[in-house]
């Protein structure tokens, strides 16, 4: 019997599971509140934070690369910095995010995440305004791009002592290159009184989402900076000795935390598995005992992302390390389809492909693009990606690493994964050939080398952004029914931060103004419909009617799929005359001739404009719906803000005014987008803060046009990022990348999919996987929201795989512990 059958099918399983767990989730608040009340038994040494000895020198007296904070001669050993921790783990999709929502709603806490995608996802879930976006834990404690190339180091311990005090210093020593740099900058900033109060001074409760993908030393790093910043700014938290409570949320049985190192001399990178924060808290006896994990562990049990009972039972067996009975292995057989079927891009077009390796993802994209190029060339976009190499800096870099024979092209090919988001270049169909050319200045000097590659994307494919990117929302594409629903529900307004409300009202008014003509030009429009439209009340709006300027009647275009004409009628004609002479003439534009821009109107005027247009638009919609028995609402509405817009067959979208005017917003990694096309036109508000060489614009630098899940169309700003390498303590700004910060969601690695909910999933484990791990099987299969939409090329449980779930015995032990809080 299913859960919902007990309630006569009135509620779905997902709703019932969430509601049944709600009371216990609320108990988490009490638990955290209790832990956050702990205080220091004594005080830390006076001014301990101003001059700190490198922890490594306490373990290794011969350590030559010591980095002290402050003045070396005044440096003192770092005192132990106490903390409390709460562990929140559970199966994929079990509702761990609900606990974060509850904490954020009931306690003054600092909510963070380990990755940009997780942080942006939390911002959406918590409905944070632009000024209160959730940050990564790295950004919260002061990490910036200059620290990316600072290598972690090995810590040396001469004896077997494993106290929490020694362990903390050892973990801090591993990350000390970064810690000391951030601390030195903070000391300088507070001396100049140029820095705002850091986030870690706001509360003693620090929530870290997806804590299973960061290395264990980050836990002690967060503790260090909590005490450091609060001591530096003499906050009430420090004066009262409030001990921080770190709430670590995530799943230790999913993707592993990785340690990556790069050798500048050989230009080789090394990647190996490390111990993540969650695994350390659970398995490390010293850390677990200090944090009293036996009493401070909360486990979510049921998968609420996919409420299918049999599938949920299967996932729990993997999560908790239970023996996989033959019937469970047989259960997985139903998802198997031939590899050739899954690898053919023409099959299961709306399904996301998941692979084990980046190479497999890249090969799939190449196969897909080859098919599209043959079947419909206009749907395949090829965009340039530029890399500007600073020649003088590159020569200095070669001297520093002692590799004088190193050339730009081989360096570029070895480092492309470091120049920007790894998956953007490792996964995508980036051209194998690169074009190098020197940028010659007017005086004949050559300061930079330009490298050009090309990236392929498919029109109307699902894409995401790799970081938070500035965008301008300029239009809407969807059904009339959907647009009217958005207007009536005020959903777009509610999702807009308070400081942007006036722009949201103005933008929607611009969309309605642009789409109003379509009611008179619809294939469903009849003389009777026009007569009813004419009778809709259109109140006088003085600031509109005083605008005497007229819009151009028509603009000739080339090779276009669509065309919009807001041509105005002669003032001497009555509405009835208009209807008799021109069936498509629109009385709306005789009343409201031109729409002013936002900055020329007050909030009250824009509110009046929005309300008036909304009433007229919905009235027109109701008339067409009545006459077509609901068919009209299913037809397509494409409208742009205060603009005539056309689309070429090649996918270029252009404005008849040569410029787009929209509402400034941001595209975020947590959202899904559809690639509509690209534009070369000017976009107001975008690109004004970027100083790029003119040669890039001459060669071509389009902006991508995307559509979100609600149907709103935006133009993405180009992404400009700097690559700074650090060698022997010296920083080298070697390269500036100009690209689009986009990545296709048509296919990705299983590791990258962690944390995502995907409607339809096809997993290709390869023909003969050599390094198949149980964690990869678990992550891949648990992404789907409905097992009926899951297919795989093999049953991975019938293959040889590594059971890397070493944490399972600890989880089973916790399940039997009466002090563990279980949330079903």
From Swiss-Prot:
Nucleus found in the keyword field: no
Subcellular location: Host nucleus
InterPro entries per UniProt: DNA_helicase_dom (IPR003840), HSV_HELI (IPR034711), P-loop_NTPase (IPR027417)
Gene3D superfamilies, A to Z: P-loop containing nucleotide triphosphate hydrolases
Binding positions (ATP): 90-97
GO BP: DNA replication
Keywords of this entry: ATP-binding, DNA replication, Helicase, Host nucleus, Hydrolase, Nucleotide-binding
GO MF: ATP binding; helicase activity; hydrolase activity
Main subcellular location: host cell
E.C. numbers: 3.6.4.-
Cellular component annotations (GO), alphabetically ordered: host cell nucleus
Keyword rRNA processing assigned: no
Oligomer and partners: Associates with the primase and the primase-associated factor to form the helicase-primase complex.
HAMAP family: HSV_HELI
Biological function: Component of the helicase/primase complex. Unwinds the DNA at the replication forks and generates single-stranded DNA for both leading and lagging strand synthesis. The primase synthesizes short RNA primers on the lagging strand that the polymerase elongates using dNTPs. Possesses helicase-like motifs and therefore may act as the helicase subunit of the complex.
Entry's family note: Belongs to the herpesviridae helicase family.
Protein name, entry field: DNA replication helicase
Annotated organism of origin: Human herpesvirus 6B (strain Z29) (HHV-6 variant B)
